[in-house]
Amino acid sequence: MTETIISMELPAGGHLAIRRNRIRPEGEERNLSRISLVSGIHGDELEGQYICYETARRVKEHPEYLKGIVDIYPALNPLGIDMASRTVPRLDMDMNRMFPGDASGDMMERITATVVDSLIGSDICIDLHASDIFVREIPQVRLSEDFAEALLPYAKMTNADMIWMNATATVHESTLAHSMNLLGVPTLVLEMGQGHDIHRSFGNQIVDGIFHIMSEMGIWTGPEPKVQEPAISSDGEVEFIRSKSDGVFLPLIEHNHYVKKGDLIGEVVDPFEGTVKQQISEMCIRDRILTE
């Protein structure tokens, strides 16, 4: 059932409506576990759109297995998704820096407060993100160290390739994930793929993890997908490789593969002169290539 969480006219023109799709078993009303999937806070990140679609499709294909509530929020920033804009169009504001909001505040504070209020009561919330247009990332859970102990058991069930502790601003203060965790709703940030793009293989991998979590929580009684054991890293265990030259980077290895000491990772080339300006290799790689 599609429900409108909030609907408002924008001061600069246009209309903003945030909707959720609530899928629940028929005839069961009380004491149901609930999972919430949130996507589209940044309108240029489309990987979560596929995950929302595929989760809803699988649930509706076998409604007899559903024993809890699945809430799907495909577009928290619907205007941004319409225009493939990271920020809220016309306002040029990053929605993921406005939580938990204020019911008595300005327009965007009221919107974010309403979203938070609608998510309270969830047994788990998963906030879906993609990388930017320049980087493709393997499926990974990003955790703040403040909540890592409580969230790690859930994170291991997501079927992600990696769990990255304290990795990014997407889990820090004023974000949806940080606010919901402070309010007692376990919330994971899942990041994968690339901006302005959808990778079905990554999406299917994470949807399998979502159904594994739902099975463990008693929300889903159908076949339980198997999940892999993720690598777990902190900031100090992730190697960043930066070029010393300008130009175009051409990778020479596959995404998400192990590398050995001294392996050639890629080249920085000059398209004007037809020359290689720098060969990128790493003498001390300890993990897989996570991004490309």
Language model features: what each stretch is:
Residues 1-292:
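Structured catalytic-domain cores with a bias toward divalent-metal coordination
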